[in-house]
Amino acid sequence: PFHPGLGNFVTCEDLRWEMGDEYSVQTVGISTAMGKALGRAGTPVYRRWQEAVLRFQQGRSPTHGAVWLTHYPTLMIEWYPNVLVVSSLVAKGPQQTTNVVEFYYPEEIVAFEREYVEAQQAAYMETCAEDDEIALRMDQGRAALLARGDDEAGPYQSPMEDGMQH
């Protein structure tokens, strides 16, 4: 039920992982649903961004769907077509964290493609809201385990969750 927009923007069929002591990198391809790049949108918000990507790319498929680099424990750098997103986590307490998100675009997009920027950020925020719900559910589950005196992890679904074991 989570990530219908992102899940139809990227494909994990060619998911690649690279892991080091303090980082992990995931690279995923661009979805080719219905036989063409970005052929089906999972949500109206993502449809708007997919159309903006294809318009800016003049119908050509982007090289990658996304590259997600996590530098433990507080930095994530995400590459999507024509945008770099940097997220920095700031701990406010044991149960509270602020995520500072910055978006970087090529000059041509910033100067002349406001629709691209707005569509991309709306799609990104849609996925963020889904991620927040997942994180809250995980926190509730971990709290329930702690209250029972249990400490369990996994099972992990490979290859999608290989980074969780890292």
Please place each PLM-identified region on the residue numbering.
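C-terminal catalytic domain of Rieske-type non-heme iron oxygenases
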Residues: 1-166
